[in-house]
A protein has these predicted regions:
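Short, hydrophobic alpha-helical segments
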Residues: 111-122
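Acidic-aromatic/histidine active-site loop/patch
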Residues: 107
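A helicase ATPase "motif cassette" and its flanking acidic/Ser/Thr-rich regulatory loops
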Residues: 103
Length: 208
């Protein structure tokens, strides 16, 4: 199953205002989870103790939070996948279910390789030495510890833009939430794309 596939090396896209930028609006001082054309991992809690979806700054200037249904679709599920009949007190389990779920494409690949493991490909081998950085991949079978030069992606899949998932279910942040985030980022002194805070200040507002 392992080392039977090798996709193209992933190139990290540049974070600028021409692309959707996902971030944790509940954070700001120590890190905001910048994600280009996507959202950072879903978290049930936050530094503010608020269970909430991350936010996306779109190239048109809109600052929006995806709905639960959108996050289900981002994971490859149908909208409503987390619908539950039992009422739960306090925080509902839906966000945790979506955040902890293995995405559908990954599960499909794992299942396909469990069913049909495939043959090990010919990889460049590198020695693993003590007190040296470990390689990204390797094994310890027969000849001892061996590193291999392998891609961090077993297969190459064209990922859709998060803009394709944007619909009327997305919600705007309140003035208070947006202003609070801007202030925390200013205080934290984090490295952010040029014009990011200015774009947030110019965004349409939703009073709370």
């Amino acid at each position: 199953m392992l080392f039977a596939d090798s996709g193209a090396k992933h190139t990290k896209p540049k974070a600028d205002l021409t692309r959707p930028l996902g971030f944790y609006w509940t954070e700001g001082r120590s890190g905001i989870g910048f994600t280009v054309d996507g959202i950072p991992p879903l978290k049930v809690g936050s530094a503010l103790g608020i269970p909430s979806a991350p936010t996306v700054l779109f190239p048109d200037g809109a600052v929006l939070m995806p709905s639960l249904a959108t996050c289900e679709r981002l994971q490859g599920f149908d909208a409503g996948w987390t619908d539950v009949l039992v009422k739960h007190p306090g925080r509902g389990p839906e966000w945790r279910m979506v955040g902890n779920a293995v995405s559908v494409p990954v599960a499909e690949w794992v299942a396909s390789r469990v069913k049909t493991p495939g043959d090990v490909l010919e990889f460049e081998k590198v020695p693993i030495r003590q007190n040296k950085p470990w390689p990204d991949a390797g094994w310890n079978v027969g000849e001892g510890r061996t590193g291999v030069v392998a891609s961090d992606q077993p297969i190459s899949v064209q990922r859709p833009s998060i803009s394709e998932f944007r619909d009327a279910s997305w919600a705007r942040l309140s003035d208070r939430a947006l202003d609070g985030f801007i202030e925390r980022v200013r205080e934290g002194g984090l490295s952010i794309p040029k014009g990011f805070l200015g774009a947030l200040r110019r965004a349409d507002r939703k009073a709370a």
